[in-house]
């Protein structure tokens, strides 16, 4: 069953293959139930290898007698979701770059996960900085070891004439499981067209960074 040319894996359906309980190694030959006289039968969940060229067509993995092979998906190489999730020029961390070719789940980057930012828009562009108003990323930094968003700035900066994106709010160090940004007193100068506060108070929600501002801070 094994083939040296194989680079991918086919999984044998658990309900279609059994081996004698006295010999459960993956490399042994599987025979019919009549050959296992006096032995009970158990499910063999060992992975079997097969030769799958780039087409990934079902014909590349022809089922053997009494076996059903699950090779998938068909034409996976032609799908944009089957390309490696990261490249050498990607801002993502290379240590977590895992190719997603031939996997049924698509459009879910597996490498674009910096320390405090979790992408939810199915594209690696989430790892790019988004000023003040995150679109694809949502800071999830309210954890003891995770209080500095990497790809998205905290949600405390509101775009307004009296706020400066670079100096409005900065996240404080994490306390327990809550992380709250603090406002610097000099971040907002009241004007005729502006509200006197650059940071709008918001309640802190678990696992989310929310601004926590007092009226005297700005």
UniProtKB/Swiss-Prot annotation:
InterPro entries: KAP (IPR002494)
Keyword field contains Repeat: yes
Chain residue ranges for the region called 16 X 5 AA repeats of C-C-X(3): 26-202
Keywords (A to Z) from UniProt: Keratin, Repeat
Cellular component GO terms, alphabetical: cytosol; keratin filament
Transmembrane segment boundaries: none
One Pfam short name: Keratin_B2_2
Superkingdom of this protein's organism: Eukaryota
Keyword ATP-binding: no
Repeat region (Sequence), residues: 50-54, 55-59, 60-64, 86-90, 96-100, 101-105, 111-115, 121-125, 131-135, 136-140, 141-145, 151-155, 161-167, 168-172, 187-191, 198-202
UniProt subunit comment: Interacts with hair keratins.
Task performed by this protein: In the hair cortex, hair keratin intermediate filaments are embedded in an interfilamentous matrix, consisting of hair keratin-associated proteins (KRTAP), which are essential for the formation of a rigid and resistant hair shaft through their extensive disulfide bond cross-linking with abundant cysteine residues of hair keratins. The matrix proteins include the high-sulfur and high-glycine-tyrosine keratins.
Family stated for the protein in its record: Belongs to the KRTAP type 10 family.
Protein's recorded name: Keratin-associated protein 10-8
Name of the gene: KRTAP10-8
